[in-house]
Amino acid sequence: MDKKELSSLIVNVKDYPRSGILFKDITPMLNNAEAYNYAIDEMLSIIKKLYPDVTHIVSPEARGFCFGCPIAVRGGYNFVPVRKPKKLPRETNTVTYDLEYDTETLCIHKDALKEGDVVVAVDDILATGGTVMAIETLVKDSKATLKAFVLLGEIKGLLGSNFTKLPIHSVVEL
């Protein structure tokens, strides 16, 4: 498995979920154990090499969980789920942001992170940057330190990385 082969398993779906959107479908990659393991290994390697002081991985639902959970388990990190409203049972911090095709709200438990925690955010695809901004806000509001974003892929043409000054690392460019 290499990055080119991994990229070939991320399929473009035209006009989904709305007309004019080119959706990146990662399910063929998830359905290929070799590719999925390769992606997780590459992402974990970035974190271990560049951010040895990390204590927590945060990931947004739903596709971010596909990467954040196994990375947290394999790396020995705490995992913080970033969820949609009314999915977390206790008091939350919340942020609303714009996607390329909708408005979204994300939440974390208020006590999930604290000052002194060192965080890397893990997600699937960086597109327009809305989720990046939301996660950065949620982590900052918790007083933890967000070090970087580690992603399966980045759609460079959408300039989502312009919405943060933090490092963004992606396994593949889309």
What residue ranges belong to the model's regions?
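Short Gly/Thr/Asp-enriched flexible loops that form oxyanion-binding sites at enzyme active sites
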Residues: 66-75, 136
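Structural motif
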Residues: 55-56, 118-120, 148
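Short, glycine/charge-rich flexible loops or terminal/linker lids adjacent to PRPP-binding catalytic cores
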Residues: 77-119
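Conserved G/P- and acidic residue-centered "switch" motifs that form tight phosphate/ATP-binding loops
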Residues: 124, 129
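Short, well-ordered alpha-helical microsegments
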Residues: 64-68, 156-159
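PRPP-dependent phosphoribosyltransferase catalytic core
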Residues: 8, 133-174
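Active-site-facing substrate-recognition patch
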Residues: 1-53
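Short glycine-rich phosphate-binding loop at a beta-alpha junction
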Residues: 52-61
